[in-house]
Curated annotation (Swiss-Prot):
It catalyses: (E)-4-coumarate + ATP + CoA = (E)-4-coumaroyl-CoA + AMP + diphosphate; (E)-4-coumarate + ATP + H(+) = (E)-4-coumaroyl-AMP + diphosphate; (E)-4-coumaroyl-AMP + CoA = (E)-4-coumaroyl-CoA + AMP + H(+); (E)-ferulate + ATP + CoA = (E)-feruloyl-CoA + AMP + diphosphate. The keyword Ligase applies. This is 4-coumarate--CoA ligase-like 6. Both substrate-binding domains (SBD1 and SBD2) are involved in the substrate recognition, and are sufficient to confer the substrate specificity. GO terms for molecular function: (E)-caffeate-CoA ligase activity; 4-coumarate-CoA ligase activity; 4-hydroxybenzoate-CoA ligase activity; ATP binding; CoA-ligase activity; trans-cinnamate-CoA ligase activity; trans-feruloyl-CoA synthase activity. PROSITE patterns: AMP_BINDING. It is an enzyme of class 6 (ligase). Residues 286-356 are annotated as: SBD1. It comes from Arabidopsis thaliana.
């Protein structure tokens, strides 16, 4: 049973009360170590991620279900299909080890099959969101030297215009109709081609090129190896499942996250299949459809990003509680949840365990994971370091390593950390420093129990008269106002002060909340130097699909509003 109270984080300006450093922190090296025992990862240098996945034994039956049609395949059938499709891709399409193949696909039961088939051949997969523009697709195709793409009907023309060979992936699961309407895809999937030479794939070989979000700069191709994918499967997905009394094979997961993103891919294309779990795949997230799918398929686990959690909470308020009876856990990642949204969820679905986690594309989604118990809950935290992971909190001004309770840039190290950025040694050298430490760019701190809290991005820090202000701190104050639905804060240049905090506020309809009211409210809650100096009322806060605030868009709105008055 999930508790309904929130843990209040320690004052980040004060150090932990421990007289001696806790066992998981070294004051000499500044290294935080996972509180969990290290796990033994496969040592065979010639082990590929697909072989590692299917080497795990379990008692699971159904592997994948299409949420719309109910079409399903078992775990046994999945392994056979992956081998069969790999043979078709090898013989019909001529794909060989080292070839780069793009998946520009929406969520479907076919997605994991195609991905696993390709990397089992030693091919390198780069994924793209199917809603990508022609310019975005062109950039990635060019940078990755893509020669072949699997895509849905609406993107065939875009990819063909770029000189890429295209395989149109059917949206149907009626194989008789597929054989007539899409014979090439049917041939790859269903015909028998016999022997395929097994390539020598090393754990250090690149398996995937996943693109970072690019919310704070140009998107970059992240090189992930078979070793990285195995680490994600073992340290993120399988380890988390091992912490609960019920077996992973009894869980039914709802896959509404994009499978083309590292969060969805690590869970639904790799890790959960090794546990024998059942995955119900939705083409795209829709709150109304989610309610029906949870009830129909008795979903037990639902990984989400913040916008999905907010939509689910809102929809759940108008639905009979019995609909969500099967739901055990909702896990959120990609962006921190505000306290207001956490409280709202816990009040609406008190029987559901809510956890947050932390990971990056650059760490193959391995980082931290939340754990709640009857005695201890840290809903605002992103959890404890995963096994085999280490961290440092670094003062971004002096470079010194900081103890628990102090804010600094989070560095992480472990087997999930990427090989580097594609064709960008300068960016790689700036991000991976001092013997494989990944600089995350996130401001964070560990509390006295080893739980990690993400505060903000270093690039977003507002510098007011020499003081440093984290926008997320002010955003937390703003959304605590009963008449404010959502808020975001960014910096505006100021000759006298350097920068000043500007708040973008979404207020409740039919309220008379004024800019002055907002400024006064924040001023009553924070130190004088942290006050909001300007307020802009907006209808919505611009955010990425994963819920990250698009601060570049806020600055654009701010610039346009200033220009319009000149």
């Amino acid at each position: 049973m999930a508790a309904t109270h929130l843990h209040i984080p320690p004052n980040p300006k004060t150090q932990t009360s421990h007289q001696n450093p806790p066992f998981w922190f070294s004051s000499k090296t500044g290294i935080y170590t996972s509180k969990f025992p290290s796990l033994h990862l496969p040592v065979d240098p010639n082990l590929d991620a697909v072989s590692a996945l299917f080497s795990h034994k379990h008692h699971g039956d159904t592997a994948l279900i299409d949420s719309l049609t109910g079409f399903s395949i078992s775990h046994t059938e999945l392994q056979i299909m992956v081998q069969s499709m790999a043979a078709g891709i090898y013989h019909v399409l001529g794909v060989r080890q080292g070839d780069v193949v793009s998946l520009v696909l929406p969520n479907s039961v076919y997605f994991p099959m195609i991905f696993l088939s390709l990397i089992s051949l030693g091919a390198i997969v780069t994924t793209m969101n199917p809603s990508s523009s022609l310019g975005e697709i062109k950039k990635q195709v060019s940078e990755c030297s893509v020669g072949l793409a699997f895509t849905s009907t609406e993107n065939v023309e875009k990819l063909s215009s770029l000189g890429v060979s295209v395989i149109s992936v059917s949206e149907s699961y009626d194989f008789d109709s597929i054989r007539i309407e899409n014979p090439k895809f049917y041939s790859i999937m269903k015909e028998s081609f016999g022997f395929v030479p097994k390539p020598l794939i090393k754990q250090d070989d690149v398996a995937a090129i996943m693109y970072s979000s690019g919310t704070t700069g140009a998107s970059k191709g992240v090189l992930l190896t078979h070793r990285n994918l195995i680490a994600s499967m073992e340290l993120f997905v399988r380890f988390e499942a091992s912490q609960y009394e019920y077996p992973g094979s009894s869980n039914v997961y709802l896959a509404a996250l994009p499978l083309c993103h590292i969060y969805g891919l690590s869970l639904f294309v790799m890790g959960l299949l090794s546990l024998g779990s059942t995955i119900v795949v939705m083409k795209r997230f829709d709150a109304s459809d989610v309610v029906n799918v949870i009830e129909r398929f008795k979903i037990t686990h639902f990984p989400v990003v913040p916008p999905m959690l907010m939509a689910l909470t809102k929809k759940a308020k108008g639905v009979c509680g019995e609909v969500f009876k099967s739901l055990k856990q909702v896990s959120s990642g990609a962006a921190p949840l505000s306290r207001k949204f956490i409280e709202d969820f816990l009040q609406t679905l008190p029987h559901v365990d809510l956890i947050q986690g932390y990971g990056m594309t650059e760490s193959t989604a391995v980082g931290t994971r939340g754990f709640n118990s009857e005695k201890l809950s840290r809903y605002s935290s992103v959890g404890l370091l995963a096994p085999n992971m280490q961290a440092k909190v670094v003062d971004w001004s002096s470079g010194s390593f900081l103890p628990p309770g102090n804010r600094g840039e989070l560095w992480i190290q472990g087997p999930g950390v990427m090989k580097g950025y594609l064709n960008n040694p300068k960016a790689t050298q700036m991000s991976i420093v001092e013997d494989s430490w990944l600089r995350t760019g996130d401001i964070a701190y560990f509390d006295e129990d080893g739980y990690l809290f993400i505060v903000d991005r270093i690039k977003e820090i507002i510098k007011y008269k020499g003081f440093q202000i984290a926008p997320a701190d002010l955003e937390a104050v703003l959304v605590s106002h009963p008449l404010i639905i959502d808020a975001a804060v960014t910096a505006a240049p100021n000759e006298e002060c350097g920068e000043i905090p500007v708040a973008f506020v979404v207020r409740r309809q039919e309220t008379t909340l004024s800019e002055e009211d907002v400024i006064s409210y924040v001023a009553s809650q924070v130190a004088p130097y942290r006050k909001v100096r300007k307020v802009v009322m907006v209808n919505s806060i611009p955010k990425s699909p994963t819920g990250k605030i698009l601060r570049k868009e806020l600055k654009r709105i701010l610039t346009n509003s200033v220009s319009s008055r000149l």
